Amino acid sequence: DEAHGTHFYFGENMPVSAMAAGADLASVSMHKSGGSLTQSSFLLCGPSMNAEHVRQIINLTQTTSGSYLLMVSLDISRKNLALHGKEIFRKVVDLTTYAREEINALGDYYAYGSELINGDTVYDFDTTKLAVNTLDVGLAGIEVYDILRDFYDIQTEFGDLGNLLAYVSVGDRERDLERLVAALADIRRRYKRDKATLMRQEYISPQVVAGPQEAFYAPKKSLPLRETEGMVCSEFVMCYPPGI
């Protein structure tokens, strides 16, 4: 699964790509960082795989009415990266590096960088990802995510209890990153509070009352939330993306 790794094939000083690491097959989501339309992706085949056999297997399950719009967007994006990929992702890295430095200069935020690489718990770092710790501002990452979306018209990728992730890709410009930095500065000025008010991030060991397989195949019914006390939820509840 190389959903977030399209740029590894074109960028310089990037983490090793799945195919370079020896994968037989890699699913690459071009729409995430390669510029194609949402839902479009490639399946890359390594030298040990019979491409015609892979195609035959895929034809057993996929629709015979594929979206030509998605396929054309894949081909256009593929050509664009083949001709200009290194230049494009060099610019993406420059933009992300600029934003990371500006955010860290604001105070209270921490935009993660390659300084975390230690050869052990952190093996490598994707410099195109702009991950920002928000706890010292006294705000959870999901709170900053919501504020950016609702009041600054900036949609980021993800927010959790302590972090915010901005996905910088082929479509971003310098002014987009400047807007993000300015918005974070304004959020710090207007909303900063004592981080002691944040919810404590304690791990609560869950009580397993049904395994995933049992829950999936069990009979289910839809109920209003107020009537579900004491019942077992048959769906997954998780931070998303990535939903793993």
Describe the residue ranges of each PLM region.
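Conserved PLP-enzyme active-site core in the AAT-like
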Residues: 1-116
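Non-catalytic terminal extensions of PLP-dependent enzymes
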Residues: 100-105, 110-244
